Amino acid sequence: MTHCNNQLIDQLLTQAEQEGRCLIPPSTAIRKALLRRTGGTVVSPMPGLFARKTRWDELNRAQRHCEIIRALAIIHPDWTFCSFSAACLLGLEASWRHLNVVHVCSSTKPSARPGSHIQRHQIEPAGAIRRAGISVTPPIQTVTDCLLQTGFADGMPIADSAILKLGLAREQLMEAVEQRAT
C-alpha cells in the first residue's frame, strides 16, 4: 500500500471519528486496503464498516452501536431505526445485550437470520422523527416496542430513562404498553 493510501485512510478514519460514525470506504481499493488492516490497526464491526481499533476499544457497547447506526443511516437514508437501536440513539438506557444487532423498521415480514447484523421488525414507522438527521420511531413507540420485547429487568432501565430523559409521563407509558399488549 502506498504512503498516499495510508494517509488517505488515516484522514478518512479521522473524519469518521469526528462525525461519530464508522468509516464507509469510498472505493473498492480503500475497502480492500482497510480489510488488509483488520486484525491490526482497524476493526470491521459490520461488513463494509470500519473503525480505528484504538478508538473502538475505548467505546462502550452503546457508543459502538450508535457509531454503526450513523454509518448505516448514510448508506440507507430511507431506513427508520426502531426498538433498541432507536432507544440507543435517543439516549435511553438499553441493556447492551440487545445491541448485538441493528433494529430497523420493515414493511415486509420480520427477519433475523442467524449471524445477521440487521434485525427487521414489521413495524410501521408512523410519525418517525429525525434525531441528528437519522430517522427513528417516535419516543413513545420506541419505548413501548422495547418494553414489549424484553423482561422486567431489561425494561425497567428503558422506562426509567424515558421518564427522566424524554419527559414521558409514567401513566402515558403504561397506557401505551397496555394498548399495544392487547
Where are these regions (language model features)?
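Short gly/ser-rich loop at a beta-strand->alpha-helix junction or flexible surface loop bordering the NTP-binding
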Residues: M1-T182
